[in-house]
């Protein structure tokens, strides 16, 4: 699995200050997507043990509220094994931190995912450009 971004101090993707991972790869390709560079599964860098160590170190602070998982689309089947393991380890080590995840798929399409048991808030559904939300803090791109 590759990723295109890792932010240790993100305030745009969930409540409070968060650690955010942007995975590479999305087959949905929503019109108007804000993150088109993430569509390719080979974009960015490989996710390694060192990447996970960076995430764990960043989460190990009282003022970090949680972990946000974005993309690309974290629910692409190619990501499931790596991300399920990562989320399990995050929840074991930091049970007080919330995990948020975004997907362009609906809940019905991801309800059997191995990621769901570790996610506290799922923001689901494809981005619809004509329903764009400009309000900061809405935590989703469109109102659908």
Provide a role label for each language-model segment:
Residues 1-6, 17, 35-100, 107-112:
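Conserved Radical SAM active-site core
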Residues 116-144:
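Classical nucleotidyltransferase
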Residues 26, 74, 106, 127:
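Hydrophobic pocket-lining residues within nucleotide cofactor-binding pockets
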Residues 2-29:
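N-terminal pre-triad scaffold of radical SAM enzymes
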Residues 10-12, 67-68, 121:
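Short glycine- and Lys/Arg-enriched binding-loop motifs that mark or flank ligand-binding interfaces
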Residues 100-101, 123:
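A structural signal for short, well-ordered beta-strand segments and their strand-loop junctions
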